A protein has these predicted regions:
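SAM-dependent transferase fold signal centered on methyltransferase-like domains
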Residues: 1-275
């Protein structure tokens, strides 16, 4: 039975609008993350308990009460049912992760993009991840044949989980973790490939990404949340900033998924050559 139908059946007799019930939830380890309409918050505990009944792997249920905030990308969830301890461990594509999804952002929905990037990195490449978080891009890449990954993270809590995950996966010799703002602490002129997995005003960080790129050129993968109608202007910004740093840019745009009404999660794959 589908999740929404399950909730409707179990909440029979409770005055809720079935169309406002969530159609699904994200599982991170033992934690279920639920987007619940504000009008249903008074039933959050019941829905949380039913979510654990629906999926026996779930031991904690948290609802979203606001948007992800700030440069540290702090999510806004609170536990409404189950275990209050939301530090969890799980394996994705052979990589072991430890994190707290109520404290750091980890989207299981971006798994395909993480796997795509790890598959296109060539042996011997040096990769810089500008927004590493707990290592969701950096570690799948490092476990392959790339020579080294520099993983930069501004949030001390996410950075601590990043260090733990590097150790869990025995990647100490391949991943260099750096704590700080990527605009201030990025390595210079070393990278064959740069990953920018931050969605908000990402183009403002592009000059730093171009500075970390090898002078012989390479590829920048820039993610951003934007309306589709802004693609042309974003491509112009990319070309302009590349020219300022001595590069010519050849850009391919991909849609990853819908981010919010009218806004898409876009990826710009930017191939850069010396001008």
């Amino acid at each position: 039975m589908r999740y929404r139908n399950y909730l409707q059946t179990k909440l029979d007799g409770v005055p809720v609008d079935g169309t406002k019930l969530p159609s699904g939830f994200q599982i991170v380890g033992h934690v279920a993350l639920v987007h619940l309409d504000e009008k249903l918050w008074q039933y959050a505990y019941q829905i949380g308990e039913l979510t654990m009944e629906y999926n026996r792997r779930v031991k904690s249920v948290a609802i979203r009460y606001g948007p992800t905030e700030g440069v540290t990308r702090k999510p806004a969830y609170k536990v409404v049912a189950g275990d209050l301890n939301t530090v969890t461990m799980f394996t994705e594509a052979g990589i072991r992760f430890m994190l707290d999804p109520l404290v750091v952002t980890f989207s299981r929905g971006n798994r395909q993009e993480r796997m795509r990037l790890s598959s296109i990195v060539r042996p011997g490449e040096i990769v810089v991840d500008m927004f590493a978080c707990v290592g969701q891009f950096a570690l799948p890449i490092a476990i392959g044949e790339s020579s080294r990954v520099f993983a930069i993270e501004i949030d001390p809590i996410a950075y601590d989980f990043l260090l733990r995950n590097i150790e869990l996966n025995k990647l100490e010799s391949k991943v260099v973790a750096i704590l700080g703002d990527c605009r201030d602490v990025h390595p210079l002129a070393v990278a064959d490939r740069v990953i920018m997995g931050y969605l908000h005003d990402t183009s403002a960080y592009l000059p730093a990404a171009l500075e970390t790129l090898s002078r012989k050129g390479g590829t920048v993968h820039m993610h951003i949340a934007s309306p589709l109608k802004a693609i042309a202007s974003l491509r112009d910004v990319i070309s302009s900033k590349a020219a300022e740093k001595g590069f010519r840019a050849n850009t391919v745009t991909r849609r990853i998924k819908t981010y919010s009404p009218g806004v898409e999660h876009l990826a710009f794959d930017i191939r850069l050559m010396p001008s």
